[in-house]
């Protein structure tokens, strides 16, 4: 019995240590959710403003720009996948990868060759383990992304998109860049603390809704400098802003998923502690009962032997 009690004590100590760790990780994830939500809210006014300006530019001018004009024939499509750098986040990364795989299969079915770009160690490890080619990958900022991180990713994607696919031989262009005719992004939308959904979106070319001028939504503008110069300056910023918004929302989703996973682990540790404590108490009671029985049995034996004398 003593050995069993000792083993159960060790298990209780281990469960308590695990509970402290998972509780701390839950609290850290909770604080990061709030910070990521603040980043999302802070980026919205700029995102709305740049979208309105670009919509006005595209609606009031007839300029062909690589980031605005759909290609007649899409031969290669770039796909940016956002995953996490660390584990212990439930199904966050695996769900994003599953959504990306569905998109890749759909692109192939449409006769488009996918070019994969990956953010996050989990996604990079997944594709490297399977010997799947990646055009570029980035790690180290999935939990706390900055606009500089988004700009670095955006520059790579914009370079590939503006290069386009010159021919069908599958080789890179003269500058070593594999051009693409279309850009997609797979990131996780933050719906609530309990719900995060990975979704694919088109990143380029920018989709502009044609609105009748009679609606009066977009007034007449005079652009200084020229509209073409404004487009050259603003469209890359628009792509970078879209990527940054996806990164911060994915960061909030990752933290929410990790918080949920760590809360579940903390609850499981609490249940283990209660279970082992009950088992230890039962073992101790059984040991005490056995000792009392042995003492009573010995006393009775002594009494019986004394009466015989």
From Swiss-Prot:
GO MF annotation terms: ATP binding; proton-transporting ATP synthase activity, rotational mechanism
One Pfam family it belongs to: ATP-synt
Coiled-coil spans in chain: none
GO cellular component: plasma membrane; proton-transporting ATP synthase complex
Intracellular or extracellular location(s): Cell membrane
Record keywords, A-Z: ATP synthesis, Cell membrane, CF(1), Hydrogen ion transport, Ion transport, Membrane, Transport
UniProt record, GO biological process: proton motive force-driven plasma membrane ATP synthesis
Similarity remark: Belongs to the ATPase gamma chain family.
Physiological role: Produces ATP from ADP in the presence of a proton gradient across the membrane. The gamma chain is believed to be important in regulating ATPase activity and the flow of protons through the CF(0) complex.
Protein name: ATP synthase gamma chain
Organism encoding this protein: Salinispora tropica (strain ATCC BAA-916 / DSM 44818 / JCM 13857 / NBRC 105044 / CNB-440)
């Amino acid at each position: 019995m003593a050995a069993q009690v000792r083993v159960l004590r060790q298990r209780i100590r281990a469960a308590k240590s695990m509970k402290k760790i998972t509780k701390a990780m839950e609290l850290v994830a909770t604080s990061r959710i709030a910070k990521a939500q603040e980043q999302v809210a802070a980026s919205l006014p700029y995102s709305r403003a740049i979208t309105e300006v670009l919509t006005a530019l595209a609606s009031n001018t007839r300029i062909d720009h690589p980031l605005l004009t759909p290609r007649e024939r899409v031969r290669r499509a770039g796909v940016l996948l956002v995953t996490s750098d660390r584990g212990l986040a439930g199904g966050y990364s695996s769900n994003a990868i599953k959504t990306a795989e569905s998109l890749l299969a759909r692109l192939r079915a449409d006769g488009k060759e996918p070019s994969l770009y990956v953010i996050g160690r989990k996604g990079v490890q997944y594709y490297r383990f399977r010997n799947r080619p990646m055009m570029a990958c980035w790690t180290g900022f999935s939990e706390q992304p900055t606009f500089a991180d988004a700009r670095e990713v955006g520059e790579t994607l914009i370079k590939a998109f503006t290069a386009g696919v010159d021919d069908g031989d599958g080789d890179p262009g003269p500058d070593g860049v594999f051009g693409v005719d279309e850009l997609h992004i797979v990131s996780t939308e933050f719906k609530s603390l309990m719900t995060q959904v990975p979704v694919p979106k088109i990143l380029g070319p920018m989709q502009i809704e044609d609105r009748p001028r009679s609606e009066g939504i977009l007034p007449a503008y005079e652009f200084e400098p020229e509209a073409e110069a404004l487009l050259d300056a603003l469209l890359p910023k628009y792509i970078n802003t879209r990527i940054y918004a996806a990164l911060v929302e994915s960061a909030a989703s990752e933290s929410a998923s990790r918080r949920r996973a760590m809360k579940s682990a903390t609850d499981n540790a609490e249940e283990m502690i209660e279970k082992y404590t009950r088992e230890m108490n039962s073992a101790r009671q059984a040991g005490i009962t056995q000792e009392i029985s042995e003492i009573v049995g010995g006393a009775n034996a002594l009494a019986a032997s004394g009466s015989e004398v």
